[in-house]
Amino acid sequence: MKKQRNLRSMAAQAVEQVVEQGQSLSNILPPLQQKVSDKDKALLQELCFGVLRTLSQLDWLINKLMARPMTGKQRTVHYLIMVGLYQLLYTRIPPHAALAETVEGAVAIKRPQLKGLINGVLRQFQRQQEELLAEFNASDARYLHPSWLLKRLQKAYPEQWQSIVEANNQRPPMWLRVNRTHHSRDSWLALLDEAGMKGFPHADYPDAVRLETPAPVHALPGFEDGWVTVQDASAQGCMTWLAPQNGEHILDLCAAPGGKTTHILEVAPEAQVVAVDIDEQRLSRVYDNLKRLGMKATVKQGDGRYPSQWCGKQQFDRILLDAPCSATGVIRRHPDIKWLRRDRDIPELAQLQSEILDAIWPHLKSGGTLVYATCSVLPEENSLQIKAFLQRTADAELCETGTPEQPGKQNLPGAEEGDGFFYAKLIKK
């Protein structure tokens, strides 16, 4: 039996690690969830994701409610108060329970002397909630995005930035990819129906299913047997443009965690696939995905800027480059991105993408296809990146995705309920 732990203090410490230390929630949360009971796992996730999604609002409120910010060793208390405010604002937890558990969290973080302060701040919010929220809703903080990102979105999308921000602040739907080597989408939807769950097919992507209500993977028919994979619809769109064929040599570059590697093999089971990623730790996820789906690929650790180190002079029929990016298209799914990224990261990422594109292009066969994809919505990483590549690469030709002046296809967050994603299909003359 798991030891009873204070979830509010655990959530506060996790959020502090993201915001103050730049750690990714996807690395922090799973080990924490192993320490709590199954029924508490979902609440811990909700508190962490929710606080990060609404961080700027909670920060704004604390600055209004407290004369001085909590600093130094007491900084965790700042995040504990955030967790308390989030519960009062956004959950159905009874206020008395939310307050009691949050105040008790001070003991868990070894700050019992501050229980009275935490209780006082949260009760003050309850008394002043109406006027505080009215003031907040008239401020720029209401967009729940850092100012640097808001400015970039406003510049790139003068007509659409508000809908992008709104989509980023929503909870994401759960999308699945049906493994066509086991089931047609319709036959798997029938199995889902028999299991008492409802799903909806995507209009454009033939393997994509959206669940009416998110569910744990072990409840999905055939998940352990590889019948279905969790993957956003927009990520599945890569296969529309890559169009892999049996017998081809295909490179999946920046492949971890392996969702697109396995999708290639579902579409073209007899393709020879090489999956490469720079992060050796994340490559373990590629192996796990291949094993669950019963598939084989050549998996290598390597830097996309130096392909000769891991593939010699080998050339490929098709290359999928899911480039390292700001991930600004998947904020609704990973709200910590808003607080992990910095404005200075964007030109650095654009430079890295440019170097990888230039390095991998010679490894594409004449007549071959390269699909450049990102989960970003920023032009510097997307259309401007491809436009510059086309201008300096004489044997590269844009195919089916946009125009040379405005290359690529940009999906915005929430469009057809998918994530923000960019694709450009390039052919080697």
Swiss-Prot record:
A Pfam cross-reference name: NusB
A GO biological-process term: rRNA base methylation
Enzyme Commission number(s) from the entry: 2.1.1.176
Catalytic activity: cytidine(967) in 16S rRNA + S-adenosyl-L-methionine = 5-methylcytidine(967) in 16S rRNA + S-adenosyl-L-homocysteine + H(+)
Gene Ontology MF annotations: RNA binding; rRNA (cytosine-C5-)-methyltransferase activity
Active site: 375
Binding site for S-adenosyl-L-methionine: 254-260, 277, 303, 322
Record CDD domains: AdoMet_MTases, Methyltransferase_Sun
Localisation per UniProt entry: Cytoplasm
GO CC term (a single one): cytosol
Protein keywords: Cytoplasm, Methyltransferase, RNA-binding, rRNA processing, S-adenosyl-L-methionine, Transferase
HAMAP family the record matches: 16SrRNA_methyltr_B
Family statement drawn from the similarity comment of this UniProt entry: Belongs to the class I-like SAM-binding methyltransferase superfamily. RsmB/NOP family.
Described function: Specifically methylates the cytosine at position 967 (m5C967) of 16S rRNA.
Name of this chain's protein: Ribosomal RNA small subunit methyltransferase B
